[in-house]
Amino acid sequence: MTLDGNGFERAIVKHCSPTLVGIKPACLFNVPGDFAQHEKQQSTGEQDRSRQAPGTRGASGQSTGKQDPSRLRNARLDALVARANRQLAGTSVHVRVLARRSCGALVLVYRPQLLARELSAPRAAATMFSWGYETTGSGWLEAAIAHLGRKLENRQRCSANGGFPHEVGLFLGYPYDDVMAFIEHEGRDYLCCGCWKVYSDQESAEACFARYKRCTRDCEAMLGRGATLAELTSMTVAA
């Protein structure tokens, strides 16, 4: 995808339509590019600039000050996220950058009330707490989302193939039993695979996958006809 307004809107609709219309608590998509915060490089660059007299130019006669490409890329992404949130104001749908990594930025589109309901269910809350997440108190949901983002960034720093922590499935509204069975079976021996790997109630899961596909198809068609993100949130999708 391209980092422009239209491209970002299309990505939201392509990957997050079920959340836009309210049948899924959250969706996640990746924006390709290097969005990692290169602290050492930035620090070194700032030290070099501080040692250089104002207005000093290099041997070529050009200014030696350089813009960090990842910083510019992050600024552009932040502007697009802010624009999307303005478009979605009053709809109960929020957009935020979940994690900034060298292999791409993960953008979370979510409905706070639906997501809080999912994560505060007794079994999910107990499991999340055992994994180090806040599950109660003022601001617990935003704290949990921020904690997930840090884990995703740290995993990518430690390994280029760091993968996703298992609790991502709970944030995305996957059935609790399927998330835990995925962990137990190490991703093997599933009944079917769609948005997630299914270990129980295959019929219900397949119906859900089909509904998500219809939702995405209809939302993409409406976007193509000029509908706004806010207008898509009022759509209804047959069960």
Placement of each model-derived feature along the sequence:
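A glycine-rich, hydrophobic loop/mini-helix early in the fold
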Residues: 73-140
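Hydrophobic/aromatic-rich, well-ordered segments within soluble, folded domains that form packed cores
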Residues: 163-192
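Long, compositionally biased
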Residues: 195-239
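A short mid-domain helix/strand-loop element embedded in enzyme catalytic domains
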Residues: 136-147, 188
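Short, flexible, solvent-exposed loop/turn segments with mixed acidic/basic and small polar residues
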Residues: 15-21, 95-99, 151-159
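Intrinsically disordered, low-complexity terminal tails and inter-domain linkers enriched
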Residues: 37-72, 157-160
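A mid-sequence, solvent-exposed acidic-amphipathic segment
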Residues: 145-172
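Short, extreme N-terminal leader segments that mark the start of a protein/domain
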Residues: 1-36
